[in-house]
Regions:
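N-terminal amphipathic, basic helical "cap/leader" segment at the start of enzyme domains
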Residues: 1-67, 73-76
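Short, glycine/charged-enriched secondary-structure capping and boundary segments
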Residues: 58-60, 84-85, 127-129
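Short coil/turn connectors at secondary-structure junctions
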Residues: 63-67, 109, 130-131
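A short, mixed-charge helix-start or loop-turn motif at secondary-structure junctions
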Residues: 12-13, 82-86
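Generic, low-specificity signal for short hydrophobic/alpha-helical stretches with a mild N-terminal bias
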Residues: 5-8, 37, 51, 82, ...
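Short, intrinsically disordered, charge-balanced linker/junction segments flanking boundaries
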Residues: 20-27, 123-131
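Detector for methionine-enriched segments
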Residues: 1, 101, 128-129
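Small-aliphatic-rich amphipathic alpha-helix that forms the alpha element of a beta-alpha
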Residues: 29-30, 69, 77, 84-125
Length: 131
């Protein structure tokens, strides 16, 4: 709710009907809000001093963090909307990154989204991220 006591439009549920099913642990681990649950993304952790230094060479916005999570979209594995050919890899990766950030916040830690980076330089610094 906002300060006026009204719900934010983005928070309102978009689900109109629910089915009652028991949720198993393995099923819960696989659930993700991605297009048809394709999960076309990968997450890399940059934590060593060397990795953090290489990452800092790709952006001016590291804010002294000691760990970085790089979320990459896998276009070849994503759902593509048939009406217009729209590939949802970037949307799905953004959803995953947002949920990771919410989980980090839930642990009492902070995070920030950094979109201003040199993508070709990042690929050069971390060739294992290719593909």
């Amino acid at each position: 709710m906002n300060s006026s006591g009204h719900a934010f439009p983005a928070v309102r549920s978009q689900t109109k009907r629910f089915r009652r099913r028991r949720c198993t642990a393995s099923w819960r681990q696989r659930l993700a809000p991605t297009a048809v649950n394709k999960q076309p993304f990968k997450v890399w952790v940059a934590q060593s001093a060397d990795a953090c230094e290489r990452l800092a060479e790709t952006t001016n916005y590291t804010f002294g963090a000691g760990i970085f999570l790089i979320v990459g979209a896998k276009e070849d594995e994503a759902w593509v909307r048939s009406y217009d050919g729209r590939n949802f890899a970037d949307v799905d990766a953004a959803i995953a990154a947002t949920h990771i950030m919410l989980a980090i916040q839930n642990e009492g830690l902070g995070s920030t989204w950094i979109g201003h980076f040199d993508a070709p330089k990042l690929k050069e610094a971390f060739p294992m991220m290719e593909g």
